[in-house]
Curated annotation (Swiss-Prot):
The lineage of its organism: Bacteria, Pseudomonadati, Pseudomonadota, Gammaproteobacteria, Enterobacterales. The keyword Mitochondrion does not apply. Belongs to the YkuD family. The active site is at H193, C209. It is an enzyme of class 2 (transferase). It comes from Escherichia coli (strain K12). Its EC number is 2.-.-.-. Residues 1-23 form the signal peptide. Disruption phenotype: Simultaneous disruption of erfK, ybiS, ycfS and ynhG leads to loss of covalent anchoring of the major outer membrane lipoprotein (Lpp) to the peptidoglycan. Overexpression of ynhG in this background increases meso-diaminopimelyl-3-a meso-diaminopimelyl-3 cross-links but does not restore Lpp anchoring. GO terms for biological process: cell wall organization; peptidoglycan biosynthetic process; peptidoglycan-protein cross-linking; regulation of cell shape. Residues 96-233 form the L,D-TPase catalytic domain. GO terms for molecular function: glycosyltransferase activity; peptidoglycan L,D-transpeptidase activity. InterPro entries: LD-transpeptidase, LD_TPept_cat_dom, Ldt_C, LysM_dom, LysM_dom_sf, Transpep_catalytic_dom. This is Probable L,D-transpeptidase YnhG.
Length: 334
């Protein structure tokens, strides 16, 4: 079943190049907590051309909105009420530098000396050209990068009837955008960079690099230093026991290795400690099973006696001036 590839093509065909984006800052939770933010609801308006326009408004990935709403169309009808998945569990990793979770199409940045985490949507490698899991660092900051297509990229482009030049100069048409962070992994072939195709952010379409919206990479580029640690993980299932005793799981669709795989039904590799978490008497195992089946992409309470809905979801019936409603757990800044 070629669900993933067909959905990607549908999204790319439907999305227009919209430049507006927002940086989302979450205040760090107390020690021992990983739950941040609040889910929001939004009613699609007449002027909303497509799902990507809505995703950019909330600086999230269109794929995450599709996960959260399950049956929504890539071009939702006006009047449709959708969930914006802006509540999340922080990755189970040290809160420093850059953390990329491929499975959730998100990049986390912990600015040194600040009690916040910045969360950005990203685009990653497609099947056969996957972005690798790695622990590395920012090896080089490159403003106004040029792009030298590899032999493989040039061949794949020729197969689509596109002849690429040996070198693409810096500028608005450069596929790397205006800013690039070269990772020290391997031979330095992997970058975190902008893009001349903003439709691709939030999808699996790159040759292995990590793509960001233009305003997002500009903000990240200005903040990070050479040597900043970078950890790339692939964890579709996250879980947390909060200080107040509440239990949560956040489940994303796993990354498929082949187009024929159905990401809604393919099995998971569960994180360490998950079996013990599920078997605890304070956890409702039926709610865990429902969360693993549903794969909604946002935290769900699985505490015994809880309901399978995410907590604290304020209504954003019609965001004014294109801005989402702001709660005390979420700050949105340009």
């Amino acid at each position: 079943m070629k669900r993933a590839s067909l959905l990607t093509l549908t999204l790319i065909g439907a999305f227009s190049a919209i430049q507006a984006a927002w940086a989302v800052d979450y205040p760090l939770p107390p020690t021992g907590s990983r739950l941040v933010g609040q889910n929001q609801t939004y009613t699609v308006q007449e002027g909303d051309k497509n799902l990507q326009a809505i995703a950019r408004r909330f600086d999230t990935a269109a794929m995450l909105i599709l996960e959260a709403n399950n049956t929504i169309a890539p071009v939702p009808k006006p009047g449709t009420t959708i969930t914006i998945p802006s509540q999340l569990l922080l990755p189970d990793a040290p809160r420093q530098g850059i953390i990329v979770n491929l499975a959730e199409l998100r990049l986390y940045y912990y600015p040194p000396g600040e009690n916040i985490v910045q969360v950005y949507p990203i685009g990653i490698g497609l099947q056969g050209l996957e972005t690798p899991v790695m622990e590395t660092r920012v090896g080089q900051k490159i403003p106004n990068p040029t792009w030298t297509p590899t032999a493989g990229i040039r061949q794949r482009s020729l197969e689509r009837g596109i002849k690429l030049p040996p070198v693409v100069p810096a500028g608005p048409n450069n596929p790397l955008g205006r800013y690039a962070l070269r990772l020290a992994h391997g031979n330095g072939e992997y970058l975190i960079h902008g893009t001349s195709a903003p439709d691709s952010v939030g999808l699996r379409v790159s040759s292995g690099c990590i793509r960001m919206n233009a305003p997002d990479i500009k903000a990240l580029f200005s903040s990070v230093r050479t040597g900043t640690p970078v950890k790339v993980i692939n964890e579709p299932v996250k879980y947390s026991v909060e200080p107040n005793g509440m239990r949560y799981v956040e489940v994303h669709r796993p990354l498929s290795a082949e187009e024929q795989q159905n990401v809604q039904t393919m099995p998971y590799t569960l994180p360490a400690g998950f079996t013990q978490f599920k078997d605890n008497k304070a956890v409702d195992q039926k709610l865990v099973d429902k969360a693993l089946y549903r794969r909604a992409g946002y935290p769900v309470s699985v505490s015994s006696g809880a309901t399978p809905a995410a907590s604290n979801a304020p209504s954003v019936e019609s965001a004014q001036n294109g801005e989402p409603e702001q709660g005390n757990m979420l700050r949105v800044t340009q």
